Amino acid sequence: MTDDAPTRPSGDAAEPAETAAPAAGAAPGDGPGPAEITGPAAHAAPAAPEGFRAGFACFVGRPNAGKSTLTNALVGAKVAITSGRPQTTRHNVRGVVHRDDAQLVLVDTPGLHRPKTLLGKRLNDLVRETLSDVDVIALCIPADEKVGPGDRFIARDLAQARPPVVAVVTKADAVTRQDLAAQLLAVDALGDWADIVPVSALRGEQIDVLTDVLVSHLPPSPPLYPADEITDEPRAVMIGELVREAALEDVRQELPHSLAVVVDEILDPDTDTTGSRVKGEGRRL
């Protein structure tokens, strides 16, 4: 199990996870999964009612398949950055969906692909080692692109996976009903899926249906995270990722795609560097 592999609660607190920025040499921190929860999520979770389910669902797919946008839609908040560039996600990002009857921990992974670089190989290895540590896998395939070699490459990998696999046809709003039906048939022919669900994260269509399907594959379990926690990403990592998202979207030609951001220090917004309070509307970070 890698540092980013999910773990279930053990009851012992651990230090917060570190940022995973390969270009900067940082390694992913411990994350939640079948053995224990570390970092901010190590705090005691509330007691579960009878019949409660909790567990982990991993979103996989080729780069730019809509995994991060879908993660944000299910959580109902921005926990993963998105951009028009493939391979924006560089480490496993966890978002928590809270319901009265279940707690679903989503693991958004980097895109799986045939690697051409060392970074690409590392990202693939990270995804594959995560697959065996979750309760259900969701393969994301966009509706507006024909099923191709990359999808078949991943489908063959997932055929050997232990957890059940749900096929998710993303970006359903981008095609006609006729084209969506054709894509659903093509995806069905790719493998033996536990379920097939078309969704539109942008319009919020079928999001509740997908959540119900994923929850149905979770084991009975008490909550793994406190009720007010939607991610276990440290604050510094979240800030760094938001900066990287803005750079990838707004400075496309001037910056390399293999951009990494490391936050060295976060100043108290109510004080300046000398310790005196900042007056007016100015804030420093």
Where do the protein language model's features map onto the residues?
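Solvent-exposed alpha-helical segments within well-ordered globular domains of core cellular machineries
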Residues: 58, 72, 91, 95, ...
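Flexible glycine-/small-residue-rich
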Residues: 61-62, 108-111, 141, 169, ...
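Canonical P-loop GTPase G-domain recognition
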Residues: 163-164, 173-231
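Conserved nucleotide-binding/hydrolysis micro-motifs of P-loop NTPases
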Residues: 86-88, 110-113, 143-147, 172-175, ...
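Conserved G1/Walker A P-loop phosphate-binding module
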Residues: 2-24, 28-136, 141
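Conserved, well-folded catalytic cores of nucleic-acid-processing
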Residues: 77, 96-100, 115, 130-137, ...
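Conserved C-terminal guanine-recognition region of P-loop GTPase G domains, centered on the G4
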Residues: 98-103, 122-196, 268-270
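P-loop NTP-binding site
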Residues: 235-285
